């Protein structure tokens, strides 16, 4: 008894366009954005971050305006809890480079977010095609906006003894990867639902 080996018809493979397969495969950048949204603790993130940094280097001389917006921290190489993504906290960075202003902001998600936020205000200065100088000015609690009382604040001056900066390594309409002066890597996604004017004067 002979065993017959079924062979696929050549036309089954001839009809497949290799370029179509390449174009439909998700890029490293798309995979990174998807993971940052859905699973920011995925162990593949550092490798994807490095790949995207090498393929999509930022150029602030060309794309500085893309920095403007409210950015949400989704991943960080830091071990400090306030520099890492936490499911029950909004960890935001608000940037307006045209006005030379920015702030880091922590607030509870959900109804508790109406109690206010912890903020650190900063002056921003572009230095070169990837580096932004950061001078922290004041930090503390900023309460909710009240019609009769305005917006209560408990802020104090920040004593910054050493220069600080951010190296923006990847920047587009959705994604920002940057490295702080201490070497910490941050990956952030833009929040189009939040307005810069609601956080900066």
Spans of features found by a protein language model:
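Intrinsically disordered, low-complexity polar regions and short flexible loop motifs
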Residues: 4-6
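Soluble ligand-binding/transfer domains with enclosed cavities or grooves
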Residues: 17-201
